[in-house]
């Protein structure tokens, strides 16, 4: 028995007095209802400055801050809030949940402050939802944040159990929790007990019910659990009844195996009070049936995200380890466990402590071969409860029949003397086997444990009852005699099979060996024999070196031998027990000689046995149901099979030498005669009960007798009277090119009519009233009569149709294919339930309103100029790059009529649309999506003047087992800074699927495309959007209908945005422009600098570059001392950067920078400290002492070469250093400089500086190109104002990071020349190696340059005074 465990940690709620006894009281009560009983609500926000209150917060597991939204977030409030964050830093495991309660105009200010402090868990009251919904959101957040450690994935299941209980009528309610071993039944039951027990007068949780009831007895156990603390022992149920009469009682019986004991236990509880609840957990559904429990909850496995979380916790692996191979290993483990929490946690613990990836992989492979005892014990306890026959069936399925058709398995097992109809149901009830899509499946763990049971019976391979491992089987069957001097010689004695073997399945894909003739001699009880090749590309090589097989076991039920190499089966083989013979691609000429007893034979498949000439023996198999002789090219006749009354299917396709069929059994359902030599069937073969004839006959007389004929294909001449067709339901006249007309078929019962390829057919009088599928592709029909109401598919691909009747009333029509109908002019309407529509290549000028149910639309290449103004397509399965472009183009054709001075009213009339598609169906499409959930772009001036809106593409990763995506949507947030420097945003929510429609099961990844012209920045004067510098940021979040963020269940993996603008007088694909993210290849550092820094002060720029260069998730307290001596205000500077979303500060006080912003900052530094492109022309031209090589050198641009003393004041130009290289044979490095006015004036002047080899006091300066601006005579005020700041920053950077960043590990003692002109802390060192490789490739290195990849980023020359190369030039662009 396990009572609700007392949580050592508690939830601390801080609030103001006004909501303490209203909203907060409801919140605390809701937490208690969820089993979180330790809730402290006595901490008033006004008391947060006192140490006693702070101590309470520090001890809490979760701290909930209920903030008054109607109060201004003043300094007092922020000081109090900071105290909570300080308490949280003292308790690293504590989570902080913020609640902004109450309607307020100050909400944006609060949200800004909370976001600045890095708090992501923010709940706020909204007008559209009640307080109860807000409370439910908070409770779920708190529960999943902290209190479900060890109960991962339980919360959603708790809600389902609670709903199941609430739906039952008042009285004694019962719920069964059912699932496979290790799936989490006990954990779920404990969670339910913890959550609900406080609402009952008495409660008990009896663990391991069968064992407990056996050890303590029923009444003693009940007394102990329901009435704890009583001295007297209750020996009779009457006494217990007196004490608990009419009370509400919660009873949980865990892991019940003996249904009879549980049934007798529950029968004595009819006296419990109304509202009592009895919960039973069991892995056997039969327990619930005997106990009369109808409400059964099947526990499902963990989804992918939950499984990964549990595995990482169990194995103590951090999410951010980042090693791809380690991630792949975790995926394999999770996939193998298939959502079973016990297996995931056990495997995680077994892999814990392995330091090397190779050790973890080896350990996992061993665990798969020999599952841990804890897992085996859990599953074997279910196996031990089975009867002998049930155990045999389970082991047969585990070893041989995984994924096989259930009817096929039942047929074989019946032939073995079992009763599989009943016994397979028992296995299903005990969660050992599942039936899905008419196939038999076992969990991977269950299958491996079943096989482990077989292998654990004995170490001797030849004595194991079932064999499936190829190398073990090869060991038993391989021929072990070799010839020496022409005589057989036994080289060693090999173990052979024994009578214990009952099944042998050999996969020959990777085997080559000779089979001994007596291989099966001792396997007297072998029931199942299958020799096959699972790899169709491999030709198996297994031969009989002696050319004979001595015997086969007479107990065989299944004989499946692909590529059988002999001409016949052993003559002494008795096939009386055979149920199936399956020997495709064999060398058989005949099965055997003489007559054999085949009374049990149901199926024979000898397809593609090209040497087969005789099958007369099959006439003795009176119970035969299927004969498959496809591709038996030498077979000349098919015997009269009139006596085979059970024969249902005959396949003679490809038997080209068969000219006639003498007699067809009366119950035949399928007759395949394609590729035979049969030209006609006698009248006697067409019986009234024939259901299907599949053939290529030229004539079938006597159709009047085929009253039940359902299928007839390739009939070259239609009968003059359709009345003779009786109950024909499928008529295929495909490619009957001479067919010119058909009679009226309105009175027929046809379901399928295929006239495709009937190129001479130009008219049709009427359609059958129950027609479901109509194919008119390639016909000459121009008009069709009224279509039947029952029609589901209409395919007129490539036909000559000019018009169609109104189809709006065809409510069953799902597929409409009009592609290639070049003469089609109009369509009057579409059915409301249409799912697939194809009209690519048509001449339609206008398309009616498309239905919301549409899933597939292909209009590529059509001439349609007008699509509906507003439409939404769901679950597209045909989504390509061209289709996306077509939608963006065709749906926006309207905007070409908008004049340049367009108004908002006209904009509001522009189309909006959305559609979606599974990502796996579009693997070849390139949408230029960027990784992550956000994308940033800069709109150029021409785009801003003609901007209409944006198209958005979002890829969302769904859990593999997630089925109900009805309420899933995407929230898109568009942010920009206006020309006054204020941060602006627009948020739009898009539904992924149409409301009220049935949503199909989503795949792992889904791509959604949205367009809404209102999703655009506001328009200022002259229709120019009010965007400062054109910078726009888009962020995407998965949400539900209550706009609750679903990041914990779904993930936005990639996204992209396209700019939609209007061009006067023309609309083309040029008006749909791809938005580029801040990719270093696509966007230069200077462009990003100008875009992102226009609204920042210089000091804030310095602070941002400092953080982007050296700090990743560092604490504010760590960063602040490093810039202590600088005129930078950390608190205000961080707030400014957070306001413009360049950084955020987490609840732990860590400075967090998104990878996009960090990359942007590095691009700025990269662009200002190292010029990658301009150095190409300057390097190679001036290496005069380098031997000539066959390289393409650029034309020299050398202006002059001068030598000056190292102490010279310089040339009065302002230069910026971008690189330095060691020169082979020289003691001194060479420095490379460019004009500091490159970007502001477009100056391309560069120079190279190197100390002279003969006189180190002299500098050799090579000038390349001329300046295009006058020599600067006065420094900018900005340079003077920032110099001191920059120097201090450099000092701080050098102190804090030189030891971890700037040291060359290959040359630790190599000195760097100091410089005052370039800061020692140049952040260019943080750039990726690929950037340095690109720099080196552009340098066109010759033989005199020391290798390489050595970029001395910080050394400088002493000759330049500080005034010449100020740090401020790094920023003054």
From Swiss-Prot:
Q: Which PROSITE patterns does the entry mention?
A: TIR, WRKY
Q: Write down the DNA-binding region ranges.
A: 1204-1272
Q: What does this protein do?
A: Transcription factor. Interacts specifically with the W box (5'-(T)TGAC[CT]-3'), a frequently occurring elicitor-responsive cis-acting element. Also acts as a disease resistance protein involved in resistance to fungal and bacterial pathogens, including R.solanacearum, P.syringae pv. tomato and C.higginsianum.
* BP GO annotations: defense response; signal transduction
**Entry's Pfam families?**
LRR_3, NB-ARC, WHD_ROQ1, WRKY
The record places domain NB-ARC at: 170-421
* UniProt short sequence motif Nuclear localization signal, positions renumbered to this chain: 988-1005
* Residues binding ATP: 179-186
- Output the Gene Ontology terms for molecular function: ADP binding; ATP binding; DNA-binding transcription factor activity; sequence-specific DNA binding
- Region Disordered: which residues? 1300-1323
Tell me the subunit arrangement.
Interacts with PopP2, a R.solanacearum type III effector.
Disulphide bridges in this chain?
Answer: none
TIR domain boundaries:
5-146
Entry GO terms, CC: nucleus
Report what the protein is called.
Disease resistance protein RRS1
- Which superkingdom heads the taxonomic lineage of this protein's source? Eukaryota
Subcellular location(s) per record? Nucleus
LRR repeat residues: 498-522, 535-553, 554-575, 577-598, 621-646, 665-688, 742-766, 768-793, 831-854
Keywords (A to Z) from UniProt? ATP-binding, DNA-binding, Leucine-rich repeat, Nucleotide-binding, Nucleus, Plant defense, Repeat, Transcription, Transcription regulation
**What other remark does the UniProt record contain for this protein?**
Ecotypes susceptible to C.higginsianum or R.solanacearum, such as cv. Columbia, contain a protein with a premature stop codon while the longer allele found in cv. Nd-1, cv. Wassilewskija or cv. RLD confers resistance.
Gene name for this UniProt entry: RRS1
